[in-house]
Amino acid sequence: HALQFVDTLQGDDTTMNKQAEDGKKRFSGIELPGRTLGIIGLGEIGRLVADAAIKLGMKVIGYDPKITVDSAWSLSSEVKKAQSIEDLLRHSDFISVHVPLLDSTRHLINASSVKIMKQHAILLNFSRSAIVDEDAILNGIATNKIKYYVCDFPSEKLQHQKAVITLPHLGASTQEAEDNCAVMVV
């Protein structure tokens, strides 16, 4: 790769510079300070996400009907309590889901949920795929309710959609995590 790059430098570098500058517009981002992150599920991971978002200058609202006393005590006082999941969905620019897959959470994000989201919301689901109704997600993308759906387990249906961003599922892909798994087995 290095030699290919050196070879391209022998050509007209103004062309390369123009291509790089012209291409930047495709990668515009979103300013996070002042935006609202709604977190569904305030267990260990949800609390860590809340803390990180606060450090980035985001407003954070949380919803967790099963929050424990210990979890509540360790939650930042800057996290505002949503009165309901609907309340959270209506007021969040970003929605991050951190709940286990149970009968009560299957399709937690469904057509009704998507309908009340803010326009152009960004939905992050690093729980389980069945937490969301995929047809509702696709409809939300088509109607611009959902700007992006971000996950680490895309299904065939969602995998190649333009507004679906897939990240690798690497939560347990560290040397320490593998060592801990080995210790638990023994």
Stretch-by-stretch model annotation:
Residues 46-47:
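N-terminal Rossmann-fold NAD(P) dinucleotide-binding loop
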Residues 147, 159-186:
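Adenosine-phosphate binding glycine-rich loop
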Residues 1-10, 51-58, 184-186:
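Oxidoreductase and adenylate-handling cofactor-binding alpha/beta cores
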Residues 35, 42-43:
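Glycine-rich Rossmann-fold phosphate-binding loop(s) that bind the pyrophosphate
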